[in-house]
């Protein structure tokens, strides 16, 4: 389906209903940004544009669905869904710690008193960037962030 002036929006819901594995990724050589947060934002925008163009017949994706495509969906497409892409027993621990307060805040919209976890997560995805990522873990090892150079069981 073409949205607007020739922009293509994939029929993701149709793919998923048919059992086609769908992952969300980024290729800075073929896009505007290498940021997965930006890829998630663009996926939300494109899916909602598709909903408008289809007059509501093809519902836009939710933030939770887009997050799933960016994590477990990508792992499943690569045949790695049993090892990575979500938290679980015997899975590799890949994670980020997001800073939402003070100097760690980056450009993220201010977290307000009373914001639940869902609201904070949405603010991070929609307005955050790498400056909000205060720690990054890959395969259980701290690869970026506070404590990386300290002698700890996690980061060393």
Where are these regions (language model features)?
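His/Asp/Glu-enriched, well-ordered alpha-helical/loop segment
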Residues: 10-109
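C-terminal cap of metal-dependent C-N hydrolases
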Residues: 92-151
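Long, low-complexity intrinsically disordered regions
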Residues: 65, 153-156
């Amino acid at each position: 389906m073409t949205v607007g002036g020739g922009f293509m929006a994939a029929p993701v819901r149709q793919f998923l209903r048919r059992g086609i594995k769908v992952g969300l990724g980024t290729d800075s050589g073929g896009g505007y940004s290498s940021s997965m947060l930006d890829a998630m934002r663009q996926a939300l925008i494109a899916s909602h544009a598709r909903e408008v163009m289809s007059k509501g017949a093809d519902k836009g994706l939710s933030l939770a669905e887009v997050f799933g495509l960016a994590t477990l969906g990508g792992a499943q497409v690569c045949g790695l869904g049993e090892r990575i892409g979500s938290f679980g027993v015997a899975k590799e621990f890949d994670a980020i710690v997001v800073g939402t307060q003070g100097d760690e805040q980056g450009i993220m919209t201010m977290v307000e008193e009373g914001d639940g976890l869902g609201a904070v997560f949405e603010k991070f995805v929609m307005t955050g960037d790498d400056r909000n990522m205060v720690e990054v873990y890959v395969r259980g090892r701290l690869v970026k962030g506070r404590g990386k150079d300290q002698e700890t069981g996690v980061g060393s």
